[in-house]
From Swiss-Prot:
Gene symbol of the encoding locus: AP2A1
Keyword field: Cell membrane, Coated pit, Endocytosis, Membrane, Phosphoprotein, Protein transport, Transport
Protein name: AP-2 complex subunit alpha-1
Phosphothreonine PTM positions: 653
Coiled coil: none
Protein family (similarity comment): Belongs to the adaptor complexes large subunit family.
Modification Phosphoserine, positions: 626, 652, 655
Record's subunit section: Adaptor protein complex 2 (AP-2) is a heterotetramer composed of two large adaptins (alpha-type subunit AP2A1 or AP2A2 and beta-type subunit AP2B1), a medium adaptin (mu-type subunit AP2M1) and a small adaptin (sigma-type subunit AP2S1). Interacts with SGIP1. Interacts with HIP1 and RAB11FIP2. Interacts with SLC12A5. Interacts with clathrin. Interacts with RFTN1. Interacts with KIAA1107. Interacts with PICALM. Together with AP2B1 and AP2M1, it interacts with ADAM10; this interaction facilitates ADAM10 endocytosis from the plasma membrane during long-term potentiation in hippocampal neurons.
Amino acid sequence: MPAVSKGDGMRGLAVFISDIRNCKSKEAEIKRINKELANIRSKFKGDKALDGYSKKKYVCKLLFIFLLGHDIDFGHMEAVNLLSSNKYTEKQIGYLFISVLVNSNSELIRLINNAIKNDLASRNPTFMCLALHCIANVGSREMGEAFAADIPRILVAGDSMDSVKQSAALCLLRLYKASPDLVPMGEWTARVVHLLNDQHMGVVTAAVSLITCLCKKNPDDFKTCVSLAVSRLSRIVSSASTDLQDYTYYFVPAPWLSVKLLRLLQCYPPPEDAAVKGRLVECLETVLNKAQEPPKSKKVQHSNAKNAILFETISLIIHYDSEPNLLVRACNQLGQFLQHRETNLRYLALESMCTLASSEFSHEAVKTHIDTVINALKTERDVSVRQRAADLLYAMCDRSNAKQIVSEMLRYLETADYAIREEIVLKVAILAEKYAVDYSWYVDTILNLIRIAGDYVSEEVWYRVLQIVTNRDDVQGYAAKTVFEALQAPACHENMVKVGGYILGEFGNLIAGDPRSSPPVQFSLLHSKFHLCSVATRALLLSTYIKFINLFPETKATIQGVLRAGSQLRNADVELQQRAVEYLTLSSVASTDVLATVLEEMPPFPERESSILAKLKRKKGPGAGSALDDGRRDPSSNDINGGMEPTPSTVSTPSPSADLLGLRAAPPPAAPPASAGAGNLLVDVFDGPAAQPSLGPTPEEAFLSELEPPAPESPMALLADPAPAADPGPEDIGPPIPEADELLNKFVCKNNGVLFENQLLQIGVKSEFRQNLGRMYLFYGNKTSVQFQNFSPTVVHPGDLQTQLAVQTKRVAAQVDGGAQVQQVLNIECLRDFLTPPLLSVRFRYGGAPQALTLKLPVTINKFFQPTEMAAQDFFQRWKQLSLPQQEAQKIFKANHPMDAEVTKAKLLGFGSALLDNVDPNPENFVGAGIIQTKALQVGCLLRLEPNAQAQMYRLTLRTSKEPVSRHLCELLAQQF
């Protein structure tokens, strides 16, 4: 930048600013400003032409007055005239005034644009930079329309100076963020990628920021940047601090550029080229190695720069989720930060480990730090760090440590900050249900929750414990005994009274044989709490009382006396009054048989997924990211509520981090009729449709019941299937995106995760399959602040798929607000074996521009695999029966991932087959069996996987009764290793 000459000091401006600062009152300041405005106006209107220096001085004064908060309605033309000056300082002040005061509706905008175009067309790099800075500072749509085509040309021009390229890249980035549709993609996109090889580090830094933003919407246009980014990163990471002296910050070479390059690489999957991938892995290992080296400076700036690169490196390792060694090393490095004296580092380490805990490769490594995390939960002074510690405990929990983690979280709950208590309660409830070893422990845990933090136990939590106790005969007696003892405490939370009233009303007879819990004692205990409770709880207790009359006839007179009391029959609350009147009449006129029929025990609730997960997601809020679990499987976990027995492909640990994606909420438990009118037991409390006794459902009906979406608003809507949306023909949609096959392969061995994500949209999947049926939930998240219009996701059946796979889709809202998400339900039925997955076409308008996206839906033939156990003799007999050449498919291939027996086992289980032990003579080999269920027929499948660790090779052999199925399954499974 040219040096400012001595004459450019503008003494008059300095005097004016000094006068303003010396004013003793607001009135004095306004008086001085008005005097100056009158002077400037007279100068501008005078007959004597002003020179450039005077114009600059007066324009600066106007700008200063405007920044003080006063309106300026003149001087704009003089500022525009300064743009035509050939002196840098005058042109600079003109651009400064334009950037701050002139809006896009100004009458002078055409003159301003002409001046900017003249400067852009000049060969003076200083003037070009001033013009580019002005465009970026204003950043309006009008500026974008005027210059969006010129700036890319300047950026990639061979004769542009480095400073101009740098300014052009940042200017284009500003315009693209403001109006993405105005920046044309063209030949320049390929050339801008090569700026990553530029010798000027400032140009590279600006180019990386631009490419990172552009590639999120147009990844294919910039995919060549991966190899260049890896190459540039490698040169930075491996360089000594003296090699990049001008860009070394406290002994750390180019930290800002390193972080930007690592973020750019997170926009793409791992490189397919082995050489590029090897070089990148070497870079990541180098960063992890440098983190272990002693610091070269004690300055905080050195550690900040070093740690910024390290954490971004760990984020990239987590993003790839394909290098077990790096994931474990990252986990160990983060473990060292857990006890760092810097609070921010401890927070970031806990946050990153939450994500690592959801990876199958690093989950065990994360668990080794459980004691440190528990200590952080107890001793951290910063509430945000304690909250992250609780999140990490939740993420690392599995069957082996569930009791310890739940116990520690309960202990922490007693002293936890009020702001996070409800969230801790929800997490404890979810973990207790998911990893319960026995139901008595689950009941004890929930009752402890109510005792410790009753005010924060939401309805979803205590609804759920009632649901589970009702459905489990083996825990009903224990629950009745435990809740009876809990109610004997002098101070008893109202939620405990609700749970106790319900359970004793249903199962109090199971403990009535003990004199200490005889029927009169049970009634007396409950009624002692009656007058201290809210109307809703008293209504529930009245329903319990009428149940007692049926269970314990000896209490009839006492209870009728309570119902007959004036405080009940003439209660000011109409609900309590009606219940008292109707229950009293029912107990007086109904025979014993009628009373027993009306007040019979509640039938089991329909099995559904817990709504507590959805409650937790809502509590975390949209900024918490995806609450959708990411596919880390825990084969030992079990559904405590008695749904289908989970297989490794359907069980996963929820990730605490999440972005826009949520879990569906189940409706509250339903209640059967207890009497006519308002006398339904708990019907008002649970506010759900009545559960009528019925014959046992078919397996298909039971399965769909377990996968029930959120409760419809009307009871009749429960009977309706999702309305099928219009299915456009394949010719109406574009081809799948280039990475569609790669995205599909991610879901071959898992059912839950993020299917697609770019700058605008995130699509998550949660699915479950049984026999030939499946249900899939698609979550569409709007990542922008702008509403999507005409949003239309549809499923397309290419070729003959319509006759092979039936997919019913439910329409979604045509508008998706910024930051919001919508859910689409798909019911899937496999009619016969198929080779091609259906396509998902997503169309919408964003900012007036049409957007279209076509993906492959993660529905592959192995999703309808049912694992089959068989003895070795049966396996070999069946293997010989499938001996025809067309029934066998075999593939020998190189391992694409580290060969780990546990990982291989998890993938085979996730694929859907059962693993058979002691069948193959070689214990290193894997043998599996299963049946593919279709509506038309069943296809038996046997597989054998032979790893050769020395040669880093696999041999995969599959035999099925249908040739196409053998070949297709072999291809699908081979891609996973």
